[in-house]
Amino acid sequence: MLEKLKSTLEKSPVIKKGEYHYFVSPVTDGIPLTEPNLLMEIVDAIEKKFDLEDIDKIVCIEAMGIHLATALSIKTGIPFVVIRKKKYGLPGEVEIRQVTGYGESNLYVNGVNSGDKILVIDDVVSTGGTLISVINALKKISADIKYVIAVVEKGEGRKKVEKETGTKVNTLVKVDVIDGEVKIINNEV
């Protein structure tokens, strides 16, 4: 299962930014090429593993959650909303301070309301900073977080998110960078 995803990740080049080993893949970066069958494999696995019947909205994070949310939305018919990097100043907009292993920035939530049953999807959980910020903001809005899904898990970020937010983070595959190459540690689906 998830053979295309695993193969794509294992072929990903690795670059080093400071002390952070960053792998470049179609799932996490949209380059070199994101093939439709890769996205379908991912959303098929999500649809099989999770009961999505009561989900009101899919919530993704700009930028690399957008293609995943789009594919999942088309497959399931569930609408999606993007947590953006740009402030729009719309009524009810919630600002999030995001601190990751490679920088700090603000994100903005629009279109998520109290009581919305949501699925949060993102490409990767690595340091956990983005998901911690997003989950805490969604809880502040009083959204009902049904699932948090990161396609790829790298490092200890998933455990950190779960510890700091009390919210389970589901992943499809766990990887590590060993000797400059991406290695599959396990897959959870």
UniProtKB/Swiss-Prot annotation:
Enzyme Commission number(s) from the entry: 2.4.2.8
GO molecular function: guanine phosphoribosyltransferase activity; hypoxanthine phosphoribosyltransferase activity
Keyword ATP-binding: no
Any single Pfam family the record assigns to this protein: Pribosyltran
Pathway: Purine metabolism; IMP biosynthesis via salvage pathway; IMP from hypoxanthine: step 1/1
NCBIfam families, per the entry: HPT_Archaea, PRK02304.1-4
Subunit structure, interactors included: Homodimer.
Protein name per the record: Hypoxanthine/guanine phosphoribosyltransferase
Organism, scientific name: Methanothermus fervidus (strain ATCC 43054 / DSM 2088 / JCM 10308 / V24 S)
Taxonomic path: Archaea, Methanobacteriati, Methanobacteriota, Methanomada group, Methanobacteria
